[in-house]
Each structure stands twice: as structure tokens, then as C-alpha cells.
Amino acid sequence: MGLVQAVVGSVGGVLADQWKDFYTVPSGLPATAALFAAVPQGTNAGRGSNTKGSSNIISNGSKIVVPEGYGLLLFQDGKITGFAAEPGGYEWRSDDLNSKSIFSGDGLVDSLIKQSWERFKFGGQPGSQQAAFFVSLKELPDNRFGTQSEIYWDDGFLNTQVGAMTRGSYTLKIVDPILFVKNFVPATYLQTGQVFDFTDMDNAAASQLFNEVVGSLAPAFSLYTNDPSKGNRISKLQQDSLGFAK
């Protein structure tokens, strides 16, 4: 029975994956979303038959539309294989057998026969993983912070230790998307349906960044109030927020 199911699964999956895909940005994203998977648009106004393709396979000839303000990261079996920072439409091409499609001129043998046999070896499913992710190149606003208790620093003007509670917001911008993904983003966010959002309280990586921002406030206040060029006055902070941030 398992053998028959594997045959049906491999053939059915191969046929479903022959269609070219059309990938775009998912709807309903928050402004602070930094990284998320491109989603295939199976139907448009009720028209379209490409609704049963494999979730981890991108067929050759598929089109990926990159909007303004975003970059495109391509993955093959967990490895970054490409990056595009310019907006526009891009065509997916891969030498992987699972991406072969008769609609992109890959031939009948590779697209159907060989691909079905390879999938049969994996119980009917493709033995490969491909993905396209969008990374925001815009400024990511409204990242809020605050302290639950007072933080202390040595004040040069008052010549004593001063404490204060703080709250505010800061803006982030990803300047190296590849380094951001390789060194910061947890693997759980490199999956379809996941959104890496810096304001998500359940995002451990974003929470760590928040903790580092709060942890840097005390030494920053100390440096500011003990800098003779600033007049040693914490009261000047509101007029010099950019100078304090530096």
C-alpha cells in the first residue's frame, strides 16, 4: 500500500509542480516586518489552477516580483544562493531536478520521468527545498523601549549619581541582508508562513536587541553628561537627540 501511495504521490506532485509560479509579497504585513517568505499566488480573481504545488519547490520559469524597498534572498537546501536588491520581476532558474518544468523548456524526460522517479525514492515527496524570502531595506520604525526600574549614571554637572526611568522608540535599517540572515535570524523564521518582526515580543532575537539597547542607556547617559562639549547638562538631551544617539 505504501508503494502505491508513493507512486501516486510522486506522479501527482510532479504534475502539480509543472506549473510556473507567480510569487509576491504576502498581504497584511506590519511596517516592522524585516524578513518573510515570498508567497505563490495560485489564483487571481478566481482564475488559476496552480493551487496544489509543493510548498518547498519553485518551478523553473516562475516569476518573483520584488517591490520597491525590499531585497530578494534565494535559498536552495538551506543555503543562500542569490540576492537581488533592485525592484522588478525575476525568473527562477535552478539545475535541481525537482524544479524542472515542461513549460520552461526543460524537456519531457527530466521534467516528468526522472523527476517522478527521484520523488518516489523519497516516498512521493521532493527531496529538495527551495525558497524565496523578502528582506526589508527600508527603515523599520516604532521599535519601542523602556525601563521597568531606574538606571543610574554619574552626572558631571550635578556631581552626583543620578537615576531615571526611560521610554522611547528607535528606528532600524538592515544594511547587509545576507549577514543579517546568516548571523542573526533564527532558523525557525526561515520557513514559509513565518514573519521576522522586531516588535514581536515572542521573537527571542528581537528581544535580545531590545535588551542591548536598554543596557547601553546608562553608559550613554554617563558619556553625554560628562562630555564638556555638551555642557554637562542632561536637560539638553531633548534638543540633541541625534547627538545622543551617536
Task: Show which residues each predicted segment covers.
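N-terminal hydrophobic membrane-entry segments
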Residues: 1-246
